């Protein structure tokens, strides 16, 4: 919420769309934004036809209004002065993301996009795919599409160039996205990867992100102590890096296919064959 409000405070008197994954998140964020002085509406499939029509009409006719919605909102919407699109969760694919951010800036003027996500979003998306009634091939393709989106999110390259490249469209750097304006510092992450992968391995590949990072950073968390993981050789070998650093680094290992999430084991982080190769190198 803090990141969203900070973003909106820099764009006072502008209209935009905020996409949420769940109906509850949609209503909760809408109420919060209104309490902070913003003019926000909510839209999702759980609302009545009259409620949805009223919200849509207000969004289309009023200025300086924010629509907080699930993906149920958007089809056929052509409001030219949408200045921003925020995703509060990871979209389902590059195609969905491209379509949704394309609703901003249709008047030809500059518009902004913001994508906020964490590992929990990836877990939810993977679980939605695995628990669907679709066939094996469809699930495989959906997971690959999600892989591409995760790679896009974690890429240090120009956002526009990477996004258009996915659709086989050649583009130069835009000199306008976060990676172009503030390029990330690239490092040789081999040793760091080995530390994280080794921690996943030594803890048995039974635990999620929080526990793995707690062990890596030498946390005295109750669960770490109860499991005896404070006595492992990897305990504390990554204490020189912050929690945020390791969360980001873990997402990158997932994006590059060196780690995977096992939903049969409640979202446990596990090492892939390519991850084992790095660990042994």
Language model features by range: what are they?
Residues 12, 156, 205:
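Flexible coil/turn residues that form the inter-helical turn or adjacent wing/linker of helix-turn-helix
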Residues 81, 124-128, 145-149, 162, ...:
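A general alpha-helix detector
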Residues 1-136, 141-144, 168-172, 178-179:
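Helicase motor core with emphasis on the C-terminal RecA-like subdomain
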Residues 145-170:
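C-terminal accessory regions
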Residues 141-143, 170-281:
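Accessory DNA-binding and partner-docking regions appended to nucleic-acid-acting proteins
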Residues 8, 59, 153, 200-204:
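Short helix-to-turn junction characteristic of helix-turn-helix DNA-binding domains
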């Amino acid at each position: 919420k803090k990141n969203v409000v900070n973003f909106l405070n820099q764009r006072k008197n502008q209209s935009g769309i905020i996409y949420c994954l769940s109906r509850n998140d949609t209503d909760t964020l809408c109420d919060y934004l209104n309490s902070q002085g913003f003019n926000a509406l909510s839209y999702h499939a759980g609302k009545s036809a009259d409620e949805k029509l009223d919200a849509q009409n207000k969004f289309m006719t009023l200025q300086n209004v924010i629509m907080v919605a699930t993906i149920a909102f958007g089809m056929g919407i052509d409001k030219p002065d949408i200045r921003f699109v925020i995703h509060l969760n990871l979209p389902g694919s590059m195609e969905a993301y491209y379509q949704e951010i394309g609703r901003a800036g249709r008047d030809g003027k500059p518009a902004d996009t913001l994508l906020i996500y964490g590992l929990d979003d990836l877990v939810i998306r993977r679980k939605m795919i695995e628990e669907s009634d679709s066939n094996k091939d469809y699930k495989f393709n959906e997971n690959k599409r999600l892989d591409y989106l995760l790679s896009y999110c974690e890429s240090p390259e120009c956002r526009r160039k990477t996004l258009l490249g996915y659709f086989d469209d050649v583009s130069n750097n835009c000199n306008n996205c976060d990676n172009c304006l503030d390029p990330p510092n690239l490092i040789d992450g081999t040793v760091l990867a080995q530390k994280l992968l080794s921690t996943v391995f030594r803890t048995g590949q039974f635990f999620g992100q929080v526990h793995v990072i707690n062990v890596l950073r030498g946390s005295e968390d109750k669960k770490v102590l109860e499991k005896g993981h404070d006595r492992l050789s990897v305990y504390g070998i990554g204490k020189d890096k912050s929690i945020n650093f390791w969360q980001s680094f873990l997402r990158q290992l997932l994006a590059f296919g060196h780690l995977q999430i096992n939903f049969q084991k409640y979202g446990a982080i596990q090492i892939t064959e390519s991850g084992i190769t790095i660990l042994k190198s």
